[in-house]
Design a protein with these regions (language model features):
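N-terminal transmembrane alpha-helices
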Residues: 1-29, 43-58, 62, 87-94, ...
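Short alpha-helical transmembrane segments in multi-pass integral membrane proteins
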Residues: 1-5, 63-128, 172-228, 284-349, ...
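Transmembrane helical elements of multi-pass membrane transporters/channels
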Residues: 3-22, 124, 135, 158, ...
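Helix-terminus/linker motif at the lipid-water interface of multi-pass membrane proteins
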Residues: 17-36, 105-112, 168-175, 235-268, ...
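Small-residue hotspots at the loop-to-helix junctions and early N-terminal turns
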Residues: 30-43, 118, 122, 181, ...
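Small-residue-rich hydrophobic transmembrane alpha-helices
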Residues: 35-95, 132-151, 245, 258-322, ...
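Hydrophobic transmembrane alpha-helices of multi-pass small-molecule transporters
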Residues: 47-50, 162-166, 192-196, 268-271, ...
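Short runs within selected transmembrane alpha-helices of multi-pass transporters and secretion channels
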Residues: 56, 125-143, 151-159, 180-193, ...
Length: 432
């Protein structure tokens, strides 16, 4: 499990490094307003994309089940259906994001000195949605059969290109947020092209052929049955984050910029933990498909132990060096001070979020996707919205806003554990 996880962890960390380069270059060479513009769009981007990227979880779980039961024909059907689905959803997202970027940013109350730059960034960024979804679906397909190395290779190549284009477009051509967005879109299309090339030319068990690129209704139904709840769960979290971002916007551009920088630092910790979540889905899914009940439990417990260790190590380390890390993003004392407040509330206990996600992965691995979605709706989104409209309304500080995160993690984690125990006990004994 650890061997499987390492390339996924490295992929996640590399992805965040490249994203951090975007923010660092913008913050240092285009100003704090541009930094706030790029950072303030992350929750909105996640809101748009999580539903569709969640569908890739359906592909991952389904292929893992078919691999476990050695059903090669259905593996092939799932691969081709998934890629077509990624293209369709990507085009839809591009159009929707381009049209609704500015109205939603206004609805979120983005500061006046930020909104035009944020709109420009979003409109360019959303042109890369087809590529982003193709890469995510392709990587999910490869992970389902235990191949975590090639997505790492492709991400590295495209990420290096992203950094070079950032330096060229932002520093040399002074294109600001537009340059960062263009660099991101170009690198995303490169990673998508590489993963399509690998599936078409190099992979035998997941062979992608143009003539077979069509949607199989049965496979689509099953991918949606697992993927839509997974995507809705991500969207639910993003929706609550959009509401929180709107509240953060009310504190001004310095707090928005500091929050954005800290969220990027958090992203490194989260990506490391998210790799364990993805590992749990694959290992639990394959063992569930093969009827190995005891291994399902063993994989879940191992994943929980690993994610707590990883979350504590990276989270506490990031907190200890938070001042130095924040100075990389901005030299403004006000921005750094605002960022440190969020660091104190989130980073030392961020492992709780990872533990919660692993339980979600285990539930999805045994075919339960609706339950974690509903649990997250109540434990994350509803609780945070209630918190903002009651406690935060009475005590309007950023700290009172940020503490809603760990409270929601603890409550949701307890619920996920209870549901996993319930559904695990319902797995037939003859599958052992």
């Amino acid at each position: 499990m650890i061997i499987f996880s390492v390339p996924v962890i490295l992929s996640g960390i590399l992805q965040l490094l490249f994203n951090a380069c975007d923010i660092i270059v913008v913050g240092n060479f285009a100003g704090d307003a541009s930094l706030a513009a790029v950072g303030s769009t992350s929750s909105l981007i996640n809101l748009f994309t999580n539903l569709f990227i969640g569908l890739s979880v359906g592909s991952n779980v389904l292929i893992a089940h078919f691999v476990g039961s050695n059903d090669k024909s259905k593996v092939s059907l799932t691969v081709h259906t998934s890629i077509v689905l990624a293209i369709i959803c990507g085009v839809f997202l591009s159009v929707a994001g381009f049209i609704f970027a500015n109205p939603i940013l206004k609805l979120m109350g983005s500061p006046d000195d930020v909104i035009m730059l944020a709109t420009l960034y979003l409109k360019i960024y959303f042109l890369g949605m087809p590529a982003l979804l193709i890469y995510n679906f392709g990587a999910a397909i490869l992970r389902a059969v235990g191949n975590t190395k090639h997505p790492l290779y492709f991400l590295t190549i495209s990420g290096v290109l992203n950094i070079l284009l950032n330096l060229l477009l932002v520093i040399c051509f002074s294109m600001g947020v537009a340059g960062v967005a263009i660099a991101t879109v170009v690198s995303e299309y490169l990673s998508a092209a590489l993963i399509i090339w690998y599936l078409s030319e190099k992979s035998e068990e997941l062979k992608l052929t143009r003539s077979d690129l069509k949607i199989d209704p049965y496979i689509l139904k099953r991918v949606i049955a697992i993927g839509i709840p997974a995507g809705l769960q991500g969207t639910i979290f993003s929706l609550s984050n959009v509401v929180i971002q709107s509240a953060i916007n009310s504190f001004g551009s310095d707090v928005v910029a500091g929050n954005s920088a800290t969220m990027n630092i958090e992203g490194f910790v989260y990506m490391a933990m998210n790799a364990i979540y993805q590992t749990a889905i694959t290992f639990v899914g394959q063992n569930y498909g093969a009827g190995k009940k005891k291994r399902v439990l063993r994989c879940t417990l191992q994943a929980e132990a690993i994610v707590v260790i990883v979350g504590l190590f990276f989270g506490v380390s990031a907190y200890i060096f938070s001042t130095e890390l924040l100075h990389i993003y901005s030299g403004s004392p006000a921005v750094v001070a605002a960022g440190k407040i969020r660091c104190a509330y989130i980073l030392p206990i961020y492992f709780l979020c990872g533990s919660m996600d692993v339980m979600v992965g285990a539930l999805r691995g045994i075919g339960q996707s609706v339950v974690p979605m509903v649990t997250s709706l109540i434990g994350a989104c509803a609780l945070r919205l209630v918190w903002i409209s009651t406690v935060f309304k009475m005590h309007r500080t950023t700290g009172m806003l940020y503490i809603s995160y760990p409270i929601s993690w603890i409550i949701t984690l307890i619920a996920h554990i209870a549901f996993f125990v319930y559904f695990y006990n319902k797995i037939p004994k003859e599958k052992e």
